[in-house]
Regions:
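Alpha-helical bilayer-embedded segments of polytopic membrane proteins, i.e.
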Residues: 40-85, 160-175, 202-271, 406-408
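C-terminal, active-site-flanking charged/polar segments
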Residues: 259-274, 278-279, 346-356, 374
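A beta-strand-loop signature enriched in Asp, Gly, Thr, and Trp
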Residues: 281-292
């Protein structure tokens, strides 16, 4: 039995949907007409700041035998990795900055500090996820093929372990993302040509090799050499055995720091991304429900299939502006720095058309996500109540009864 939710836009006529689509298109065009130097300065400043944090972290980790230096270096490195993946890499690969015609800050040339190849990410995320957002059986991000996060998904015994899968995915998120585009279900069904599978394997193995060498051999090796050089210069260590021990300490200290920074980045990215589509407020769809979908209908699906996270400017920066997940799904190619600017206009459209605007603090959204994952590990599950139309101040009214049905994310 499927869990059903009252459609949040069943009250809209075809003319309403068409007009709504035109209004959303107009916002996009107005922003693009206004892009200029302040936008260029923004992304270049963020990239510069990220590099400075990375350099500071690496320098501090040259003294990784010292605990305060190790902690500070690890923190700088973790923050640098978060910025690189969330606000820079993800958004550059969306083509948000292609309008600059900068050969370096461009979706066709950018590579990022994570295990996933840019090519695989652009296919699984930019194309599959953003095209088929929240469509059951089409959007592979709904549970990442290992978890049941919607009561409309058929239960299988393997889902009993999904709370454990979730913890492992949280810690090693970059590796889960790296293999995501493999499309395991298509391979099992024999629908994916082996030439494509082999191409994916080569891409994953090559990127994995580079990441492992960089984080767990290259930088630790540099730290070990720097430790030995410093102690030789200062004359603190004279014997060969002592130098060897110092080198080993520098190597392992840097390696532990890189591992810790990667885990911190993975947990943060997992938390922000899962809060984008899995909280109670969001809707899922069947393929039949989106047949003959118009441009306005696409906007509506993106609007109610996503959920925002409220927070201040610093939070939005380190979350890659994915606290504005609604705006990001409406305009994935718009510079992320503009989402806060257009959010009031999106809310205004929601209010005028009696549509929900999904948002909540991180603690609330994340709590709902983990509760849903735990509950739907078992058979059954019913949808949670959905918010009603937006009515200013991020306070939706109570749901109203309307005809029409849509699938509902629930626990």
């Amino acid at each position: 039995m499927t869990a059903q939710a009252v459609s949040p836009f069943a009250h809209l006529s075809d003319a309403d949907v068409e007009q709504l689509g035109k209004e959303f298109d107009a916002i996009h065009q107005e922003v693009y007409n206004d892009l200029g130097e302040r936008d260029r300065q923004y992304i270049r400043t963020v990239i510069k700041m990220q590099r400075q944090l990375a350099v500071a972290g690496r320098v501090l980790l040259l003294a990784s035998k010292n605990k305060p230096a190790w902690a500070a270096g690890t923190a700088c490195l973790a923050l640098a990795k978060i910025l690189e993946n969330m606000e820079i890499g993800h958004n550059v690969l969306h083509g948000q900055w292609d309008w600059m015609n900068d050969p370096y800050i461009h979706s066709s040339t950018w590579d990022w500090d994570t295990a996933s190849t840019a090519e695989a990410w652009k296919h699984s995320h930019n194309y599959i996820h953003h095209t088929f957002t929240n469509i059951l059986g089409k959007d592979k991000d709904l549970g990442y093929e290992i978890m049941r996060i919607d009561p409309n998904q058929e239960w299988r015994p393997g889902y009993l372990l999904q709370p454990l899968y979730n913890l492992l995915l949280m810690a090693f998120f970059e590796w889960g993302v790296a293999v995501h585009d493999m499309d395991v279900e298509a391979i099992r069904a024999g629908e994916k040509p082996w030439a494509d599978v082999w191409h994916d394997i080569k891409g994953i193995s090559g990127k994995a090799r580079d990441q492992i060498i960089k984080d767990y051999a290259g930088w630790p090796g540099i730290s070990a050499l720097a430790t030995v050089a410093l102690e030789r210069i200062t004359g603190k260590v004279r014997s060969a055995n002592a130098l060897r021990d110092s080198a080993l300490g520098g190597f392992t200290g840097a390696m532990r720091a890189n591992f810790t920074a990667n885990i911190i980045r993975n947990v943060w990215a997992h938390s922000i991304i899962f809060c984008g589509h899995f909280p109670d407020q969001t809707y899922t769809f069947t393929e039949d429900e989106v047949k003959n979908e118009t441009r306005g209908g696409w906007y509506l699906r993106q609007l109610v299939g996503a959920a925002n996270i409220t927070g201040g400017p610093l939070f939005h920066l380190i979350s890659g502006n994915l606290g504005y997940q609604v705006e990001h799904h409406l305009y994935p190619d718009m510079p992320s720095s503009r989402y806060a600017e257009i959010a009031p206009r999106v809310r205004d459209i929601c209010e005028r058309y009696d549509l929900p605007y999904n948002a909540g603090p991180l603690s609330k959204q994340l709590g709902m996500v983990h509760r849903t994952i735990a509950r739907l590990a078992f058979p059954g599950g019913r949808r949670k109540p959905k918010p009603g139309p937006y009515r200013g101040g991020l306070r939706p009214v109570k749901p109203t009864k309307r005809p029409g049905q849509l699938s509902g994310t629930a626990a």
